[in-house]
Amino acid sequence: MPWIQLKITTTGQQADTLSDALTESGAVSVTFQDTHDVPVYEPLPGETRLWGDTDVIGLYDAATDIATVLDVLKTHPLLGADFTYKIEQLEDKDWEREWMDNFHPMRFGERLWICPSWRPVPDPQAVNVMLDPGLAFGTGTHPTTALCLQWLDGLDLRGKTVIDFGCGSGILAIAALKLGAAHAVGIDIDPQAILASRDNAQRNGVAELLTLYLPQQQPQDLHANVVVANILAGPLRELAPLIIDLPLPGGYLGLSGILASQAESVAQAYAAAFSLDPVAEKEEWCRITGTRR
C-alpha cells in the first residue's frame, strides 16, 4: 500500500527526541539519515553515533491526516510553528521484487563468480559461489569484500588451509574452498554469522570442509596457509598480535575493511612480521596483503 514520508532535519543531539515525537504522532517507523551523506565508521562499543545534521524520517499510513500530524508537531518545543519539513508520497511497490532485481551475478578476478540463487549462472565452467543477501555481512557488493575475493582468486589455494577471520556470511571461506582450498576455518563474534556461514556452506556443498568458531571456541594452536580478515581498521590494529600468529611461516595474509586514509596505521601494525605488498585500493577502501616472514 502507499505511504506518506515526512522528513525533518535536526541535529544529531536532538534526533532521538524528535524520533519519539514522530512515533507518538502516528509514524509506523522512524529512520535516521545523514543530511550531507557523510558516512560514520567504527562507533565505540555501545555507541550509536549520529551526524551533525540528521534527517529524521517518519513513515505514515496513506490514510493518515498529515495536516493534523503537522499541527501536533508544531507544538513540540524542538520545532515550533515555523519548522521546515518535506512530505513525499511513496507509491506502492513490490519491494521484495525490486530488492531482488538489484542483485546480479558478479565476477571477481579470472575464475570466481558470486551468484544469487534466483539468477542463472553466467558461466557454468567458472568457480561459482551461490550466495543470497541474508543474516550477515558479505555478498560481494561492498568494495572490501570485492578486494578480498579478487585476492583469493589470484592465489593458488589447492590443498591449502584458509582462515576467514570475521567471516560474516562465510563468503570468503566458501570462495576459498570452491577455489581449491582443502579446509577453511571461519571465526566471528556474532552467532548469526556462524549460522549464516554454515547455511551458505551447505548450499555450496562445502559444509564438511568448513569449521566455524566463536572467538572463545578458537583453538590456541590454530594456524593456516592463508588468513583473510575483512573487518575494520580499529580491530585490525587492536587484534594484530592475535592475527599475526595465525599464518604459518611463508603463509599469506589479506586485510580489508580499511579506508585508504587508515592504510598506513594498519600496515605499521603488521610490517615487522610480514613482507607487505603494495596497497590495493577500490573506491575509498583498500586491501593490505603480505607474506609471513
UniProtKB/Swiss-Prot annotation:
One of its GO terms (cellular component) is cytosol. Gene3D superfamilies: Vaccinia Virus protein VP39. Its main location: cytoplasm. GO terms for molecular function: protein-lysine N-methyltransferase activity. One of its GO terms (biological process) is methylation. InterPro entries: Ribosomal_L11_MeTrfase_PrmA, Ribosomal_PrmA_MeTrfase, SAM-dependent_MTases_sf. Its EC number is 2.1.1.-. Keywords: Cytoplasm, Methyltransferase, S-adenosyl-L-methionine, Transferase. Pfam families: PrmA (PF06325). It is an enzyme of class 2 (transferase). The keyword Cell membrane does not apply. S-adenosyl-L-methionine binds at T145, G166, D188, N230. The keyword Transmembrane helix does not apply. It catalyses: L-lysyl-[protein] + 3 S-adenosyl-L-methionine = N(6),N(6),N(6)-trimethyl-L-lysyl-[protein] + 3 S-adenosyl-L-homocysteine + 3 H(+). Transmembrane segments: none annotated. It is found in: Cytoplasm. CDD domains: AdoMet_MTases (cd02440). Methylates ribosomal protein L11. Belongs to the methyltransferase superfamily. PrmA family. NCBIfam families: prmA. This is Ribosomal protein L11 methyltransferase.
